[in-house]
């Protein structure tokens, strides 16, 4: 069987990464967290004292930035050059500025090429905002994952509490709404559902139920 490509897109905190990781393990595919790649570039800008809206300097930073994933339990580790930044890329500052960095054409072009290279050499589950529309337009299965703003804010709140971070629930709702607007209105590869993507609403659904539903869709599309 040739390499099989699964694209999972959707807004922030819809459950993409959680679902994609479990599916990749279940199917023995490579998990590609594209959001982590954009976060890593955003963090690299911070570490180099570059303003998040300085497109030219961030463009020049790309050639000096190696991003590496290493399998691990319970979470895949993310490396910026040789530094483990798995936790650091999830900080509030990176979260609130990654949309700006991800909107730059050169950043997207560079990372899309890296993502396609991985997909050309492996069967992958890739999640992000524009996988089915831009990165892997010929993906074998495309999923568009959604959930209500209230539910997504609750999920983010629980994640923050588990990390010892305290953020007001209403603030999280506003941040998610702002992120949705930025992601869906940017000029380059805006967040949008591919015409051939299957819509899966995770509101009120357990992780196991969503995984089972998508695994069934994938298995029905695999031709041996």
From Swiss-Prot:
UniProt keywords, alphabetically: ATP-binding, Cytoplasm, Kinase, Nucleotide-binding, Transferase
Coiled coil ranges: none
Molecular function via GO: ATP binding; CMP kinase activity; dCMP kinase activity
Any one Pfam family match given in the protein's UniProt record, by short name: Cytidylate_kin
Keyword ATP-binding: yes
Binding site residues for ATP: 10-18
Subcellular location field: Cytoplasm
Domain of life: Bacteria
Reaction(s) this enzyme catalyzes, per UniProt: CMP + ATP = CDP + ADP; dCMP + ATP = dCDP + ADP
Uppermost EC category: transferase
Gene3D superfamilies reported in the protein's UniProt record: P-loop containing nucleotide triphosphate hydrolases
GO process annotations (BP): nucleobase-containing small molecule interconversion; pyrimidine nucleotide metabolic process
SUPFAM superfamilies documented for this protein: P-loop containing nucleoside triphosphate hydrolases
Protein family according to the UniProt entry: Belongs to the cytidylate kinase family. Type 1 subfamily.
Name this polypeptide is given: Cytidylate kinase
Organism: Leuconostoc mesenteroides subsp. mesenteroides (strain ATCC 8293 / DSM 20343 / BCRC 11652 / CCM 1803 / JCM 6124 / NCDO 523 / NBRC 100496 / NCIMB 8023 / NCTC 12954 / NRRL B-1118 / 37Y)
């Amino acid at each position: 069987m040739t390499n099989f490509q699964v694209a999972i897109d959707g807004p922030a905190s819809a459950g993409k990464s959680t679902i994609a990781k479990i599916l990749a393990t279940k199917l023995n595919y490579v998990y590609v967290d594209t959001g982590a790649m954009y976060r890593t570039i955003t963090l690299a800008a911070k570490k180099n004292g570059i303003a998040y809206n300085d497109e030219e300097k961030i463009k020049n930073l790309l050639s000096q930035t190696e991003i590496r994933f290493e399998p691990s339990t319970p979470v895949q580790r993310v490396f910026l050059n040789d530094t483990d930044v798995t936790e650091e890329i999830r900080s509030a500052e990176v979260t609130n500025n990654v949309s700006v960095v991800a909107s730059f054409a050169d950043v997207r072009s560079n990372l899309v090429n890296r993502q396609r290279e991985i997909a050309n050499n492996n069967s992958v589950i890739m999640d992000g905002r524009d996988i089915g529309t831009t990165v892997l337009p010929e993906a074998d299965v495309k999923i568009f994952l959604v959930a209500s703003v209230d539910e997504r804010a609750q999920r983010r709140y629980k994640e923050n509490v588990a990390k010892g971070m305290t953020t007001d629930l209403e603030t999280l709702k506003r941040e998610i709404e702002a992120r949705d607007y930025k992601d869906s209105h940017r000029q380059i590869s805006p967040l949008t559902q591919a015409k051939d993507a299957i819509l899966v609403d995770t509101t009120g659904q357990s992780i196991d139920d969503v995984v089972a539903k998508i695994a069934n869709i994938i298995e029905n599309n695999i031709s041996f």
